[in-house]
Amino acid sequence: MTTSVKHPLGHRNAWTLAAAGVATALLSMAPAPAAAQQKFVSIGTGGVTGVYYAAGGAICRLVNKDRATHGIRCSVESTGGSVFNANTIKAGELDLGVVQSDVGFNAYNGEGQFKQAGPYPKLRSVFSIHPEPFTVVARKDANIKSFEDLKGKRFNVGNPGSGTRSSMEELLATMGWTLKDFSLASELRPDEHGSAVCDGKIDGFFYGVGHPSANIQDPTTSCGAKLVSLTGPAVDKLVEKYPYYAHATIPAGLYPNNPGETKTYGVTATFVTSADVPDATVYTVVKAVFDNFDDFKKLHPAFANLKPADMVKNGLSAPLHPGAEKYFKEKGLL
């Protein structure tokens, strides 16, 4: 899996304007006619500065554009991330959500962090979105050349409920490490870890994200933070053992002060739902995205190189929902 982004990351103002555009589109649309019977669907995402929130916003924007016709109103919820989304869909409190492919696999099969809860056989895939290389970022003056150099350092392992945290714990276990191997294992959210690095509160952080990402752009621009390659026997073992992992490369020069490419591994962001969500609802959501695919790709730089043929198969860790399957078959994608 190689992350290749054709358009370099611009200034932060571009991110602010893009986010504002999505928010404005979601909030300013004219109400649907009173005669239309409204159905509300909610999408669980992640922190408001992350790519998951942008993905949910992009999907809802396209769904809501024609809600007067199909009667579905879509809303985005900022959440703790992948694990939270999977659990909340299972509880029936979210209709759809974005989850890492490894989290989806574990939730469906009752493995990893879901072992105690047991399998969730009703989890269904809708489509995959973007690749998510695991990214290690360190303070410029921390002298961190490899992940092993972080032993004894102050390191952010991800907030509870996030896919980042789940993947971090799996990597540590494979390495034979625990959280006690760090002098501080902080649990900051993605919109907090960049400033913590620049303020000298932590030495680095681990983050699974689609690139380019504002939460990595900020510390690399503001204080010259460095991306650290994540390779070695533990990574090779994980990639060989689990179908949802793959080696990945973050392109050279994607972020300021990081002229070389960064070798790592990662997962895929996937859009999921429950088998209990009606086929017609999922069909409508999928149709809104793929009938307006060029518009969808423009709503975040991480979506720029997406291809429908890949999104119907890559990284899907649960069976495809019948509503999604119907649309993809109609379009010859299956």
What is the role of each PLM region?
Residues 24-34:
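C-terminal segment of classical bacterial N-terminal signal peptides
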Residues 101-103, 112-113, 142, 178-272, ...:
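Pocket-lining segment of extracytoplasmic ligand-binding domains
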Residues 37-151, 159, 227:
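Short, glycine-/small- and polar/acidic-enriched structural segments
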Residues 192, 199, 209-227, 237-240, ...:
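An extracytoplasmic/periplasmic, membrane-proximal ligand-sensing/linker region
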Residues 40-66, 128, 132-199, 294-297, ...:
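Bilobed "Venus flytrap"/periplasmic-binding protein-like clamshell domains
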Residues 60-69, 90-94, 109, 173-177, ...:
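Sec-exported extracytoplasmic/periplasmic mature domains
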Residues 2-21:
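Bacterial N-terminal signal peptides that target proteins for export
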Residues 153-170, 244-313:
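Ligand-binding clefts/hinges and TM-proximal coupling segments of bilobed small-molecule sensing domains
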